[in-house]
Amino acid sequence: MEGKVDVLLTWLKKSDKFYIAPNISICESPETGRGIVLSHGSIRKNDIIVSVPSSKQLNFHTILYHISKFNKELNIPGITIDRKPINYEDNIIEAENKAWADPRYGLYSELSKEFLLSLSSFQLVSFYILVENFLLPKWTHNEIYSDWKPFFDVWPSMEELRSIPAIWNCDPNSRYHSLIEYLPAASRKHMARISGLVREDWETISEVVLKWNEIYGSLSCTKNSDKFTSDELFSLFVHVYFIINSRCLYAKIPLKIEDSPSNFTLVPYVDFMNHICESDLHCYPQLSPQLRSEGENIIGIGQFTIRCGDHLYDNINEELFLNYGAHSNDFLLNEYGFVVDGNKWNYLDISDEIIELIDDDKKEVKTFLLEHDYWGDYTINETDISYRIFVALNYYVTRDERRVRKFIEGYISEDYFKPKISSVLKELLVSLTAKYTKTLSELTEKVSNLENNLCLQNLITIYKGYIKILTQHLQDLQS
């Protein structure tokens, strides 16, 4: 990996707008993967750690710019290549002379402005990476590579992303599909949501990808070779999707400003930085939209800079972290494939258990809770049992509509209902503790039989966190 990082830095330094602090380096370990560490000296508040020019980022705007190099009909003012320079006609002639050797001239020219703008960022970025990183080398027998190859080459392999549950669910080649049954409710719901997005995005772009895969051998600029199968293409797409999902950073994309999930960019070198659950203490991002020029060209969305926050880095080999925020281990596992021991933002989603308990034959409880918008979304965190759980159990146990309504409105405190529901609540928490302890025991037994057990260890960490939360609340009920 060290050699690939050197190539990446050489590529980035071709722009005089790239900056990297002289006292940081990449560190790699089996436990934590790659990260950025302090090599000497110190880094203080507001110091620049790394600053990446607009032209070296991958996002909706830069991809349209690069596609327009091969598609002379694609013209979006301020986004695509400027067609006005004096030497533009010469560039067109030069491009046409190269077209016989590079399939992108023919294929990207098929993409209409309307089609490209209809895509979300995830769809366009994943489509572009799939073509540039995987299809182009195969089409040309590794004779033509993307300009982005130095960036592509430092991305994680599918095996390195193996701990993300949606990959277990989506990738036909995943060896971890059997672990889905051990996912807790919150993770299972998150996995299902992401899996749906993956399949939806693939459905949107697959027609073009599959068509190109079929015709590439007939193009004069490609050499005969085995095509990818549809399963192989989908597996590659899943790989690309989770590279994007695990590395994208929030940034405003003017063409997609109304579509919140599309507002992101991929930033080389910055994506080596790991996240930490502490808020507003470590490093933070800064986007400068006014800094978009690269020579005579205007490219992308602006300079992306990482600066040091309040934390002083002055210990050699200390890892530099990006501020992350309040995310539970279920969220972290499903979005990024890792968990954090002792994560204070953990919570349990016990909606299924509560609904199973209170959903009576006459649907009386459900009707009342639906009318008052308290049906579902029942959670417990380290310090609190959610108000929604109290509302649900209060009505389930007492069926006292008048008093429960007053409780909802804040006129009656929890103290009135607590003695009435404590036995039911305690029984529920004891049952959950036993359930999670049993699952934890099964997972622990599985771990001892495997060499590579990262996926299992992550699940074990989640269940240990659950049991810790339940134990704390059971102690509170008994005190």
UniProtKB/Swiss-Prot annotation:
It is an enzyme of class 2 (transferase). Its EC number is 2.1.1.-. One of its GO terms (biological process) is positive regulation of transcription by RNA polymerase II. This is Ribosomal lysine N-methyltransferase 2. Residues 22-325 form the SET domain. CDD domains: SET_SETD4. S-adenosyl-L-methionine binds at Y324. S-adenosyl-L-methionine-dependent protein-lysine N-methyltransferase that trimethylates 60S ribosomal protein L12 (RPL12A and RPL12B) at 'Lys-4' and 'Lys-11'. One of its GO terms (molecular function) is transcription coactivator activity. Belongs to the class V-like SAM-binding methyltransferase superfamily. RKM2 family. It comes from the Eukaryota. Present with 768 molecules/cell in log phase SD medium. Transmembrane segments: none annotated. Keywords: Methyltransferase, S-adenosyl-L-methionine, Transferase. InterPro entries: SET_dom, SET_dom_sf, SET_MeTrfase, SETD3_SETD6_MTase, SETD4_SET. PROSITE patterns: SET (PS50280).
